[in-house]
Amino acid sequence: MQVIVALAALGSLAAPALGFSIPRGVPVSQSMIDVKLSSTGNSMVKATITNNGNRALNLLKFHTIMDSNPTRKVSIESEDGKEIQFTGMMPTYKEKDLKPSYFISLPPKGTVEHSFDIARTHDLSRGGKFTLKAEGMVPIAEENGTEITGAAKYHSNELHMTIDGEKAASVENAFGIVKRGPLTRINKRTSIDMQSCGNSQELQALTAALKASAQLSSMSAQAVSQNQDKYMEYFKDPQYMQTVQSRFQAVAQESSSTTGGGTTYHCSDTMGGCEEGVLAYTLPSQNEVFNCPIYYSDLPPLSNECHAQDQATTTLHELTHNPAVQEPFCEDNGYGYERATALSAEKAVQNADSYALFANGKLNLITLMLIIDPD
């Protein structure tokens, strides 16, 4: 019976959304906000965000140019066209119960500035000439509200900077080298930092999430070729089918490897990245994943709701951010169903949430519950 249900689920992936998703049907503006980049020092950048509309807006900061965490806010290319390695964090944020502090209020025609040092999240020690630009989509709430009612795309100007490599190297990186305790492969899975797992309940929850991530990823790898309509909904172009399938297979292997994986998973935050609203985060430059307290307190192990977050798919999402799982690793190009399915094929195939959303079909979750706990 379990096998029959599992096969049926492969052809019936739903269309859920993770994270602070933009509700279906809300308007997406191409010109509601303007973002201008300017240089204010050797590696300091100022983003000036302008509300072009005639009404006040509440702009959600998460995964945007305004994010206060050391996330990727701009793309940086050297003079020879090579992308500069990102050394910051890739967080997964909680969708529900958004707080006013997560937003920036912007009056009509008003502006707000956000400054950041790109040397904290990129290796610029070689110095020289660099080209920066920013693009993305900002979830929007009405004035004084926290319910997402729309979104605004932004594309900044290109900023050309000449950076002193020695000065850039003297800037403290947002995250140093991760110090690990003893490593253990729990039930032959990815390496877990046991020193970070002082709470036995957290260790048990992480172990279960890895098992569920492995099974969801394995089923999704099969679904890529068995449900092409659903594949096209998320990834747009059949030429990337093998890439998507191989990434799901890589995540499944990393979650349940019999030979040991390339990532290290931490039950708790040992690097100070768990700011308010962060469920978990990855340091892709080091192949390290960290769970935050609300990963355990606010998420169920598995949800039977299509649009809900849970521990299993959050773990799956984080693993796609690691180059040790598959290169190039996934970015956060679009978060939530509306943003993920609006991406181009080239962006979608490299978007972490596209994989988590595809895997997080309601029937897949119900099937997995039956497989894990048939009683």
From Swiss-Prot:
Compartment(s): Secreted
GO biological process terms on file: proteolysis
Protein name per its UniProtKB record: Probable neutral protease 2 homolog ARB_05817
Secretion signal, residue range per the UniProt entry: 1-19
EC number(s) recorded for this UniProt protein: 3.4.24.39
Keyword Secreted recorded: yes
Function of the molecule: Probable secreted metalloprotease that shows high activities on basic nuclear substrates such as histone and protamine. May be involved in virulence.
Record-listed Zn(2+) binding positions: 317, 321, 332
Active-site feature positions: 318
Cited InterPro entries: Fungal_M35_metalloproteases, MetalloPept_cat_dom_sf, Peptidase_M35
Domain of life the protein comes from: Eukaryota
Cleaved propeptide residues: 20-189
Keywords tagged on the record: Cleavage on pair of basic residues, Disulfide bond, Hydrolase, Metal-binding, Metalloprotease, Protease, Secreted, Signal, Virulence, Zinc, Zymogen
Catalytic activity: Preferential cleavage of bonds with hydrophobic residues in P1'. Also 3-Asn-|-Gln-4 and 8-Gly-|-Ser-9 bonds in insulin B chain
SUPFAM superfamilies (UniProt xref): Metalloproteases ('zincins'), catalytic domain
